[in-house]
From Swiss-Prot:
Protein name: 2-C-methyl-D-erythritol 2,4-cyclodiphosphate synthase
Alphabetical list of PANTHER family matching this protein: 2-C-METHYL-D-ERYTHRITOL 2,4-CYCLODIPHOSPHATE SYNTHASE, CHLOROPLASTIC
Originating species: Halothermothrix orenii (strain H 168 / OCM 544 / DSM 9562)
Gene name for this UniProt entry: ispF
Record's function text: Involved in the biosynthesis of isopentenyl diphosphate (IPP) and dimethylallyl diphosphate (DMAPP), two major building blocks of isoprenoid compounds. Catalyzes the conversion of 4-diphosphocytidyl-2-C-methyl-D-erythritol 2-phosphate (CDP-ME2P) to 2-C-methyl-D-erythritol 2,4-cyclodiphosphate (ME-CPP) with a corresponding release of cytidine 5-monophosphate (CMP).
Keyword Cell wall biogenesis/degradation: no
Cofactor: how and how many bound: Binds 1 divalent metal cation per subunit.
Transmembrane annotation, as ranges: none
Gene Ontology BP term (one): terpenoid biosynthetic process
Annotated InterPro entries: MECDP_synthase, MECDP_synthase_CS, MECDP_synthase_sf
Residues the entry annotates as binding a divalent metal cation: D8, H10, H42
Amino acid sequence: MRIGIGFDVHPLKKGETLILGGVHIQGEYGLAGHSDADVLTHALMDAILGAMGEADIGYHFPDTDPSYRGISSLKLLKKVYNMMKPRGFSIGNIDLIIMAQSPKLSPYYNKIKENYTRILQLDSSRINIKATTTENLGFVGREEGIAAQAAVLLIDTKEGDINAG
């Protein structure tokens, strides 16, 4: 078994689209970034890559590469999944936290889970999503940005041993 942790932050910007877990969330502000700025999916990809010992998304999908400009982070997640499977890993579980002062995100959890279960080929019971505010503290509290954190447990299916890898 291997554990990976991912973290990402993007600034909020008026007129941008807010995308979390591949879901478009209506609002006046969205996240700015080189790709679609899906902070939740970025944290998830970093957690999976970290558990595999494969650096981070900046290494694999650099923002200096114009081919990633505006790309859906779900497409990048599929690429990460395609790196993971041939190496004999499967996902044990995923735990995600979104840090945002607003909007209320719980109505979107099921759609986010649907996106992730489709791409990662796992049951939705293996994915947990939660959101929290920072009680108006820091850049999240001032609504300057949104942060996300992910923890992932990978199981080495080739070894079948809890100490594998």
